[in-house]
Amino acid sequence: MPRTAAVTRTTKETDITVRLDLDAAPYEQPATGHGFFDHMLDALARHSRLGISISGTGDLHIEPHHLIEDTGITLGQALSQALGDRKGIERYGSAFVPMDETLAHVVLDLSGRAHLAFEPETLDVYGDAGGMTHYHLREFLRGFCNHAGATLHVRLLAGREAHHVIEAVMKAFARALRDAVAVTSDALPSTKGSL
């Protein structure tokens, strides 16, 4: 059975389409109209090694919050659909990723339960990257977790510069996601018998 999904989310603020194939290579440059966010979505696709296509528009004349959050929501919905009953997946993934002075650690559980623990919000991260801050990243990941049924822990072990923090976290998230969606058995990875 193909592990694919296509989801569109349209509101008065945004119009986002995500196509996802968990067993294919990345296929398109993201196109949301926000340069740095597109760069991060490209990193997500490349480092997860998943077939991810994201396009959309948003009210960037106000600020990027709605676009970034709604993209996380839509990606989470697409992942949940593509995983189906989650039978056979590894379920867990984790990764450490350095970027210059920054070191990020991300741990992911595709448990069906939504939770985000996002340490960088309690730290003194400074600056932004093309108008994207670590707070925007938090909202992207929160939207993803809430709609994918995922538990995600994000720790920052070193670094405070926003560009490097965002990029290291996004790449660590991608690598954890790659491992968690991998099919490694034919059983459901739960002692409860359901996820």
Swiss-Prot record:
Annotated keywords: Amino-acid biosynthesis, Cytoplasm, Histidine biosynthesis, Lyase
Location relative to the cell: Cytoplasm
Catalytic activity, reaction form: D-erythro-1-(imidazol-4-yl)glycerol 3-phosphate = 3-(imidazol-4-yl)-2-oxopropyl phosphate + H2O
PROSITE patterns hit by this protein: IGP_DEHYDRATASE_1, IGP_DEHYDRATASE_2
One MF annotation (Gene Ontology) recorded for this entry: imidazoleglycerol-phosphate dehydratase activity
E.C. numbers: 4.2.1.19
Pathway stated in the Swiss-Prot or TrEMBL entry: Amino-acid biosynthesis; L-histidine biosynthesis; L-histidine from 5-phospho-alpha-D-ribose 1-diphosphate: step 6/9
Any one GO biological process: L-histidine biosynthetic process
Cellular component GO terms held in the UniProt record: cytoplasm
Primary residence: cytoplasm
InterPro entries: IGPD_sf, ImidazoleglycerolP_deHydtase, ImidazoleglycerP_deHydtase_CS, Ribosomal_Su5_D2-typ_SF
PANTHER family recorded: IMIDAZOLEGLYCEROL-PHOSPHATE DEHYDRATASE, IMIDAZOLEGLYCEROL-PHOSPHATE DEHYDRATASE HIS7
Family under the similarity heading: Belongs to the imidazoleglycerol-phosphate dehydratase family.
Protein name per its UniProtKB record: Imidazoleglycerol-phosphate dehydratase
Organism taxonomic ancestry: Bacteria, Thermotogati, Deinococcota, Deinococci, Deinococcales
